[in-house]
Design a protein with these regions (language model features):
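Extended ligand-binding regions for polar small-molecule ligands
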Residues: 32-44, 75-87, 136-140, 144-158, ...
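N-terminal Sec-pathway targeting helices
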Residues: 3-19
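Generic beta-structure capping elements
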Residues: 61-65, 135, 228
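Extracytoplasmic/periplasmic ligand-binding sensor domains
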Residues: 161-170, 179, 185-193, 197-211, ...
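Hydrophobic alpha-helical membrane-insertion segments, chiefly the h-region
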Residues: 20-31
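Acidic, polar ligand-binding/catalytic clefts
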Residues: 78, 82, 86-87, 91-145, ...
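Extracytoplasmic small-molecule ligand-binding "clamshell" domains
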Residues: 10-11, 38-118, 150-154, 164-188
Length: 257
């Protein structure tokens, strides 16, 4: 009887040991997977998909009228796809579109939005906040104290600017089709100030000797790569390559500066 109990106890101990090994192995595997995901390392299945689909051409809609990011076939967005092709062999059909028009629904799109919280399928590449500029050197501490001034904004930004600053009856907004028109209006003294995105317009600000008089950190543009919402290997490959590319690009920027 004692021998039987002893055997049963040994069996229970062995079962617990086996379960412990299985659980520990699962935790280790999960940690390795999470680490690989965080570093943009492709899984075996993803590598296999890439090898089998190198002849596949993936449609990507890409902004083509935004300085620095996508302009006449050059910029950050185009560099990303070129590096993606070079490193994986995947080919992309780059479908250009302009910011004033709707992009083709290709499933993969470089676009701009001003969301406070991005969706899971939107991969952030850069954030550019807005500034108020002027021909005169000054610092505005309180926007609400501006009196009897005309501010230039693009038509697409008017609602956003008004929502942020609220009602100020002494401020008049003149709207324009694009930033170039705003710059000309400011140079010709048709407006006192202008509100525009900062980084992509630095060349315009510096070349015209404009001054940044108010930094608007709560109004910004997100430059994102939007992928379709499906769970598949290609989407996973996109996300991991994005992680790898962003880390490399950041390190290259730090080294260069």
């Amino acid at each position: 009887m004692k021998n039987k109990k002893s055997v049963d106890i040994k069996k229970i101990i062995i079962i617990f040991i086996i379960l412990g090994i299985i659980i520990a192995g699962g935790i280790i595997s999960l940690n390795i997977k999470n680490k690989n995901d965080a570093n943009g390392v492709f899984s075996v299945l993803e590598k296999r998909w890439i090898e089998k689909n190198k002849s596949t051409v993936v449609d990507v809609s890409i902004l083509n009228d935004i300085p620095i990011f996508g302009y006449e076939g050059e910029g950050v967005f185009f560099d990303f796809l070129d590096d993606f092709s070079k490193d994986t062999g995947i080919e992309f059909n780059k479908i250009p579109y302009v910011s004033s028009k709707q992009s083709k629904d290709s499933g993969y799109t470089f676009e701009i939005n001003n969301k406070a919280k991005l969706d899971d399928n939107e991969l952030l590449m850069y954030t550019d906040n807005y500034v108020m500029i002027s021909k005169e050197s000054e610092k505005i501490k309180d926007f609400n104290k501006l009196d009897n001034v005309i501010i230039g904004v693009t038509e697409s930004d008017l609602t956003l600017v008004k929502e942020y600053f609220g009602n100020n009856d002494t401020v008049i907004y003149n709207t324009y089709n694009n930033v170039d028109s705003i710059v000309n209006a400011l140079k010709n003294n048709d407006i006192k100030y202008a509100i525009i995105p900062n980084d992509i317009n630095l060349d315009k600000i510096f070349s015209n000797n404009f001054y940044v008089v108010y930094n608007i950190t709560d109004i910004y543009n997100n430059y994102v790569l939007k992928i379709n919402g499906e769970e598949n290997l290609l989407n996973s490959i996109f996300k991991k390559y994005y992680i790898r590319w962003m880390k490399h690009s950041t390190s290259m920027f730090i080294v260069s500066t």
